[in-house]
A protein has these predicted regions:
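Active-site-proximal beta-alpha loop/turn segments in soluble metabolic enzymes
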Residues: 177-188, 220-235, 264-270, 284-285, ...
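Catalytic-core signal marking the mid-to-C-terminal active-site face
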Residues: 2-8, 15-20, 241, 248-249, ...
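Accessory "access/gating" subregions that flank catalytic or transport cores
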Residues: 188-193, 197-212, 225-232, 243-259, ...
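A generic structural motif
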Residues: 39-41, 120-126, 189, 229-235, ...
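ATP/Mg2+-dependent ligation/transfer catalytic cores
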Residues: 2-213, 235, 424-481
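Short glycine/proline-enriched loop/turn "hinge" motifs that connect secondary-structure elements
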Residues: 104-111, 149-150, 214-219, 266, ...
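Histidine-centered divalent-metal-coordination microenvironment in nucleic-acid enzymes
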Residues: 156-170, 216-228, 260-282
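Short, hydrophobic beta-strand segments
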Residues: 115-121, 223-229, 275, 378
Length: 481
């Protein structure tokens, strides 16, 4: 995995787990370990093992789980079209092998621990289509080049006063937002959300995830909690833990939260991804080499273009790769039908074109920071994105730019929504899926098995959507047609 050799406060090791398991009379005792595999939707799937069974057996042999976990849709419905696990194989087991670097107390359940796992075939070999494995393959490509990725995600969600059961009883419509109006950046009008949000923040901090900030966003009831950047795998694990924690703590509080990209006609939920590359020794690689007086040393190209000031050649090619691959990789950033409702919203901060800019929020690639903090912000992913696949896509696109020495076109200084000559993102999941399936770049970077597996997942999503009668159809046609 090439994860940095460090351990955050709040994480557990096996010796601590044994001690907590033995102290059965203590309120800090742990009696269960939840072993979770992130699925194609970025949800934790798996089983709870008694702590004794985990220590005595699961650590050595893993935990069996049905292979269909990586071949189902949002509804957990199986589909016959996956080469990975078709019906005629009988849907046998793979084994969930715990990644002990992720072991911690479950933030939503004080007597349980949780650990992330990788899927392995019984005969050996990691299941390549598992999202963690997809990201690991791209991290390995970085590692062979002497590189490592640091990442952070900014994930938004909506808070409602109703419970999940009440929301379901109302068909998830007509719900009461936890704030009555736009309180973006406001310190007024957020008290209705503060109780649940504070509980989530504290629980995540106790689980070893450093909280940097939290604030309300544009949509009524919308909030964003920002955690400190980390190595790319840890950030994606923390992202999934955050979503899982938020949903469980909301349910315990009798409330509901949603991370769906576009709940209604208001602002959608984004998941902006910040990413930079470092050397394996921690050296800064995105910033140009400084002169003795601290100014960045320009090369011939950056000396002629002010928009490139401070960016290393490696960073420029990395950003150019984002632009070159963005349309073909859109499926990794926007994996559902609903994703494209967010990206199609006029007048929102969700990008529609393929461009980059300096601190320009109308561009899908926003270059921010300076020196060691110089990084890209990828603004296409929504709250429904699988973080492992999104970050893997950003890395693969960047490596395509670096390996092919791509030149970076001029930055967009104005409104990228209306700028002439700006290519557009796919407008629908169908368009994105076709571009992904036919992408030679994707097949070279990820392998045919991964490309075909994710393309079929989009097929299943589209088949469900295209055969579902919606409220929109009934409202328009029931009486008037």
């Amino acid at each position: 995995l090439n994860r940095p050799a460090r351990r955050h406060p709040g994480l557990l090791d096996v010796d601590e787990l044994r001690r907590l398991a033995a102290s059965t009379r203590s309120p800090d005792s742990i009696d269960e370990v939840l072993v979770g595999l992130p699925d194609l939707q970025g949800r934790l799937q798996g089983s709870g093992a008694s702590v004794d069974h985990f220590i005595e057996d699961v650590l050595a042999r893993g935990l069996p789980a049905c292979a269909y976990l990586l071949a189902v849709d949002v509804e957990m419905d199986t589909d016959a079209g996956y080469a990975f696990a078709p019906w005629d194989t009988g849907f046998g087991d793979f084994r969930l092998v715990p990644d002990l670097a992720t072991l911690r107390r479950a933030p939503w359940h004080p007597r349980s621990a949780v650990v992330f796992a990788d899927a392995w075939w019984p005969a050996g070999g990691m299941v390549r289509v598992a999202p963690r494995a997809v990201l690991r393959a791209q991290l390995d490509r970085l590692y062979t080049r002497g590189l490592a990725a640091l990442a952070g995600t900014e994930l938004e969600f909506l808070v409602f006063t109703e419970s999940y059961q009440q929301a379901a009883d109302r068909s998830y419509g007509g719900l009461t937002s936890a704030s009555r109006y736009n309180v973006d950046y406001s310190l007024i009008g957020t008290s209705e959300m503060d109780g649940l949000v504070r509980t989530i923040r504290r629980a995540m901090a106790d689980a070893g995830v450093r909280v940097e900030s939290a604030r309300a966003e544009v949509h009524p009831g919308q909030y964003e909690i920002v955690f400190r950047y980390d190595d790319a795998m840890s950030t994606c694990d923390n992202h999934v833990l955050y979503k899982t924690t938020a949903k469980n703590l909301a349910a315990q509080a009798g409330q509901a939260v949603t991370f769906m990209a576009k709940y209604d006609q208001g602002e959608g939920n984004s998941c902006h991804v910040h990413l930079s590359l470092r050397g394996r020794d921690g050296a800064t690689l995105f910033a140009a080499e400084p002169l003795e007086d601290g100014r960045a040393a320009p090369d011939e190209e950056s000396a002629e273009r002010a928009d490139l000031a401070g960016m290393s050649k490696l960073m420029r090619s990395f950003v150019a790769g984002q632009l070159a691959c963005m349309a073909e990789f859109a499926l990794l950033f926007a994996p559902t039908v609903n994703s494209y409702k967010r990206l199609a919203a006029p007048g929102s901060f969700a990008p529609t074109g393929i461009a980059w800019g300096r601190d320009n929020r109308t561009c899908p690639v926003r270059v921010v920071g300076s020196g060691r903090s110089l990084r890209i912000e990828h603004r296409v992913p929504g709250g429904d994105a699988n973080p492992y696949l999104a970050v893997a896509g950003i890395i693969a696109a960047g490596l395509y730019g670096i390996d092919n020495d791509l030149a970076l076109p001029p930055a967009t200084a104005g409104n990228a929504f209306t700028a002439p000559g700006v290519a557009r993102l796919p407008r629908t999941l169908r368009q994105a899926q076709r571009l992904w399936r036919s992408s030679e770049i994707a097949r070279a970077a990820f392998g045919d098995d991964v490309v075909d597996h994710l393309a079929h997942a989009a097929d299943a999503e589209l088949a469900s959507y295209e055969t579902t009668v919606t409220d929109w159809e009934r409202r328009r046609a029931f009486e008037r047609l």
